[in-house]
Amino acid sequence: MYETLFWQFAKIWAVLIPLFLAVAYFTYVERRVIGHMQDRRGPNRVGPRGLLQPIADALKLLFKEITIPTYASRTLFLIAPAMAIMPALAAWAVIPFDDGLVVADINAGLLYILAMTSLGVYGLIIAGWASNSKYALLGTLRASAQVVSYEIAMGFALVGVLIAAGTMNLSGIVHAQAGPFWEWFWLPLLPLFLIYWISGVAETNRAPFDIAEGESEIVAGFHVEYSGMAFAVFFLAEYANMLLISFLAATLFLGGWHSPFEGLPVLGPAFDWVPGIVWLFAKAAFFAFCYLWFRATFPRYRYDQLMRLGWKVLIPGTVVWLVVLTGLVYGGVGPWF
């Protein structure tokens, strides 16, 4: 029993430690990429080419005081960051990095992911309410409405993946996409793929859907009263969720660890030496780059535009395509057999 527990803890930390490092350096990459897009250098002073900047930022936040507003609900104010970060980390337990390389290979993996992504908003709601600030409360109201709206669209998009793969096990979904890149789910499920990606960006409160923070409108939204490591935990949760949505997109629609040349006569054997985890990381890196690209490119949606997009475009679009997809699957049409 103790060996089993030790092995489980080892697997958990084998995922969490690289994840924390990835989040830290994702912030560095974001500042460098957006800097180049805006024709400036970005961080380049701390360490060679600024590579130690994330460590400097972490130390700065570590030594800052966590100030609690006078009229805030102290207990809830301190609990909220933990409630935001825990679902963001727990969701990684079912992500398969390669064949058999997963912390918990459960059959209800897709349902588990939906549950974890839904729970994260409670941290935002409690943070805004406990701060006793009108700006934080406005950010909380926006965040809750946004997550409810886009969680439905994302859930319907993932139902399409379930219909196509015939399983909720994430490893099983990846196995169902075995073959070259045109046999992955991105092509037959293209409308659902696009809706999933738009909903994923909205769920993580990133530009152009960052109305919950809205610096130009409500100062900084739900975490306006937070400082020090309490603020850093919210920051960590946001970037962990961004990476999670990117890895999920690669897993559910782009074949996971499968090579894009798998099964091809010449290119297939030529790329057989590349480990599956490298392909997965490369696909996820593309989606992570898109987050940065969107932030540097698109203006923020107005609140009414965001709600209209979710309720009048994405949700009806997923319902229509699910009806079409069900007919195709039952009719034996498509690459699902």
Swiss-Prot record:
One of its GO terms (molecular function) is NADH dehydrogenase activity. PROSITE patterns: COMPLEX1_ND1_1, COMPLEX1_ND1_2. Its main location: membrane. Its EC number is 7.1.1.-. The chain crosses the membrane at residues 9-29, 77-97, 110-130, 154-174, 181-201, 229-249, 274-294, 313-333. It catalyses: a quinone + NADH + 5 H(+)(in) = a quinol + NAD(+) + 4 H(+)(out). It is a multi-pass membrane protein. Pfam families: NADHdh. It comes from the Bacteria. It is an enzyme of class 7 (translocase). GO terms for biological process: aerobic respiration. It is found in: Cell inner membrane. One of its GO terms (cellular component) is plasma membrane. Belongs to the complex I subunit 1 family. NCBIfam families: PRK06076.1-2. NDH-1 is composed of 14 different subunits. Subunits NuoA, H, J, K, L, M, N constitute the membrane sector of the complex. NDH-1 shuttles electrons from NADH, via FMN and iron-sulfur (Fe-S) centers, to quinones in the respiratory chain. The immediate electron acceptor for the enzyme in this species is believed to be ubiquinone. Couples the redox reaction to proton translocation (for every two electrons transferred, four hydrogen ions are translocated across the cytoplasmic membrane), and thus conserves the redox energy in a proton gradient. This subunit may bind ubiquinone. This is NADH-quinone oxidoreductase subunit H.
